[in-house]
Amino acid sequence: MQCSWKAVLLLALASIAIQYTAIRTFTAKSFHTCPGLTDTGLAERLCEEGPTFSYNLSRKTHVLILATTRSGSSFVGQLFNQHMDVFYLFEPLYHVQNTLIPRFTQGKSPADRRVMLGASRDLLRSLYDCDLYFLENYIKPPPVNHTTNRVFRRGASRVLCSRPVCDPPGSSDLILEEGDCVRMCGLLNLTLAAEACRERSHVAIKTVRVPEVNDLRALVEDPRLNLKVIQLVRDPRGILASRSETFRDTYRLWRLWYGTGRKPYNLDVTQLTTVCEDFSSSVSTGLMRPSWLKGKYMLVRYEDLARNPMKKTEEIYEFLGIPLDSHVAHWIQNNTRGDPTLGKHKYSTVRNSAATAEKWRFRLSYDIVAFAQNACQQVLAQLGYKMANSEEELKNPAISLVEERDFRPFL
């Protein structure tokens, strides 16, 4: 019985590998996918009737927002979601993680990471080609007739909540809030969603489930995709404060430290150090400017975007070579100086952006900040975040902890 847990873990990892290999084998045979059908005759008949997806050979520009949790990625996602010619998807890789990685391993092992990244790259490649049927491999329970109510945060995508994908009662110009979308639109028809995707010139996807830009090299180098990466970073101290408030149970020991002034002996410091290590590795790659990232990579600090959202958004769109939509500018004006009471929801994007970027300084004790600074010293210097050398410096809003840096895109 002593080794029973090891046997369970090995069986789980073997199961993951088998699932992923099966999906890879299936999709390698054809770009035309009809997942989830066990009746051979029925599968052939439906495949003949369904739409055939071909890889995008045009020079459309597609976008990947590479971020980590609580770094401002939902805000950046909205800069693309509001564009009328962009098909935006919010965290589709959630489904890969939820399907392939056993909850009890938490996806921390190297084997888990390899499986997750391989499957993620395959799904991203398909989604950029508007092959939304491929997503069905990871939706549980499987969609019926390509319809489902299980797409993660479907309401965070404007296109998936408007005509022709959704036909809500009322005005055709009605813009649904996320909760209203799920309630009023009913099941998501992936065939209609794929059609809406193909009608637009660009696909933008946000993910917090790819650790480093190196993990995307195969996609960046694929000339059929013309993919550009926006890497969003934030002061790790701010990320820690935001996660502690949002994920109260997971970050309970950090909150206990804040409340008692004593560091718990069993504190999971990797909740902080993993962010810093991934940032450092990924940003180091980007700043070394390898040839495969030329014209493909832009580093954006959340703090710069929060302080001057319109200017930074214009820079982002200029890098991408996509005209800035007036709807995006209007959204920025309405959502970066908002009523603070509207931004209390943990996933809200309505807020005073400049104030939000600095709020962490009043939500962490100085001993926690000092610990974080010691653990993340390298990446803080790399990204231009200043050390707070005392409680007084930390709490004084007149003292900026963000250096003026000009992270120009690699063109």
UniProtKB/Swiss-Prot annotation:
GO terms for biological process: galactose metabolic process; inflammatory response; keratan sulfate proteoglycan biosynthetic process; sulfur compound metabolic process. It is an enzyme of class 2 (transferase). Glycans are attached at N56, N145, N189, N334. Disruption phenotype: Mutant mice are born at the expected Mendelian rate and have normal developmental and reproductive potential. GO terms for molecular function: keratan sulfotransferase activity. Its EC number is 2.8.2.21. The keyword Transmembrane helix applies. Broadly expressed with highest levels in central nervous system. Expressed in cortex (at protein level). Expressed in high endothelial venules in peripheral lymph nodes, mesenteric lymph nodes and Peyer's patches. The keyword Membrane applies. Belongs to the sulfotransferase 1 family. Gal/GlcNAc/GalNAc subfamily. This is Carbohydrate sulfotransferase 1. It comes from Mus musculus.
